[in-house]
Amino acid sequence: MAPEVLPKPRMRGLLARRLRNHMAVAFVLSLGVAALYKFRVADQRKKAYADFYRNYDVMKDFEEMRKAGIFQSVK
């Protein structure tokens, strides 16, 4: 019996094939992470800022700081 011969591996274009596959996976993963960040972090942060400034009174905050003595030029 003759020993079984293994087929030769395809070496031509090996790096290009692997890079193409890995680039596609990296692109899809980066889009997923960007979407996840937008919905989990950015939108909640934007909502928190909007809620804060909806009820924020500048003059009330200024008067509290003035009474606490933070400003040197305002008596």
UniProtKB/Swiss-Prot annotation:
One of its GO terms (cellular component) is mitochondrion. The chain crosses the membrane at residues 14-54. Residues 55-75 are mitochondrial intermembrane. GO terms for biological process: cellular respiration; generation of precursor metabolites and energy; mitochondrial electron transport, cytochrome c to oxygen. It is a single-pass membrane protein. The keyword Cytoplasm does not apply. Its main location: mitochondrion. It comes from the Eukaryota. Keywords: Membrane, Mitochondrion, Mitochondrion inner membrane, Transmembrane, Transmembrane helix. Pathway: Energy metabolism; oxidative phosphorylation. Residues 1-13 are mitochondrial matrix. It is found in: Mitochondrion inner membrane. The keyword Aminoacyl-tRNA synthetase does not apply. It holds the Pfam family COX6C. Component of the cytochrome c oxidase (complex IV, CIV), a multisubunit enzyme composed of 14 subunits. The complex is composed of a catalytic core of 3 subunits MT-CO1, MT-CO2 and MT-CO3, encoded in the mitochondrial DNA, and 11 supernumerary subunits COX4I1 (or COX4I2), COX5A, COX5B, COX6A1 (or COX6A2), COX6B1 (or COX6B2), COX6C, COX7A2 (or COX7A1), COX7B, COX7C, COX8A and NDUFA4, which are encoded in the nuclear genome. Belongs to the cytochrome c oxidase subunit 6c family. Component of the cytochrome c oxidase, the last enzyme in the mitochondrial electron transport chain which drives oxidative phosphorylation. The respiratory chain contains 3 multisubunit complexes succinate dehydrogenase (complex II, CII), ubiquinol-cytochrome c oxidoreductase (cytochrome b-c1 complex, complex III, CIII) and cytochrome c oxidase (complex IV, CIV), that cooperate to transfer electrons derived from NADH and succinate to molecular oxygen, creating an electrochemical gradient over the inner membrane that drives transmembrane transport and the ATP synthase. This is Cytochrome c oxidase subunit 6C.
